[in-house]
Amino acid sequence: MENNKVDVEQSLQLINNMIQKAKANFTDNGHGWLIWGTMIFMASLSTYFFIEYNFPNIFLAWNIFGGIAILLLLYNFFKPSHSKARSYVSDILKYVDIGFAVCLFVIIFSINVSVGPNNGFGYLLMIYAFLMLIQSGALQFKPLLYGAIINWIGSMAIFLNTELKYDMLITAVAVFLGYIIPGLILRSQYNKEMATSKQNVEL
């Protein structure tokens, strides 16, 4: 009977250790959210002003964003990992990122051939929100959950709206609140954790 009690305690301790290890593996310095958020924010605002002032190529900023995005995604997928530790959850999240990238390009393709930009950007915000929801669960980080909700609301607002220039403003606001602000919070938390770890090592 006593051995069974010890086994149960050891099992619970093992599970707890695995959970803590998993949490440690999913730290995020916020740089990715800031980079992507800033690019989308700038592309959206640029497009708004291009439309407002009758610029001949209103999607110039998005074309530039698309080229940079392809390079960043390729780098992210093929860069060597500095950590040898792998987990079931990290493998799943890698496939989620791949699926997100594929959906992103399918939506962009549809904007160019059939759906049109007025609805297409609504679908983009919808897929952004889906990624935020998953990452908020992996990181146990509420601001990304709030960002997901904001982006879903933004996508519905775009579907209700009929003018592309206002779609761009909605996208800019949704991305600022959903990407950039959580990214700044994550970076601040990460810097504090690194400073604390450095102090502990020095002690």
Language-model segments: what does each one mean?
Residues 35-42, 64-71, 102, 127-130, ...:
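Lipid-exposed faces of alpha-helical membrane segments in multi-pass integral membrane proteins
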Residues 1-29:
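N-terminal juxtamembrane cytosolic/stromal segments of multi-pass membrane proteins
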Residues 23-109:
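Selected alpha-helical membrane-embedding segments in polytopic membrane proteins
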Residues 134-203:
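Terminal transmembrane helical module of multi-pass membrane proteins
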Residues 53-61, 112-120, 163-170:
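Membrane-helix interface and helix-disruption motif detector
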Residues 54-55, 81-84, 114, 189-197:
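Membrane-interfacial segments
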Residues 87-148:
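Membrane-proximal helix-loop-helix units in multi-pass membrane proteins
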Residues 44-47, 73-77, 111, 155-162, ...:
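Structural signal for membrane-spanning alpha-helices in multi-pass inner-membrane proteins
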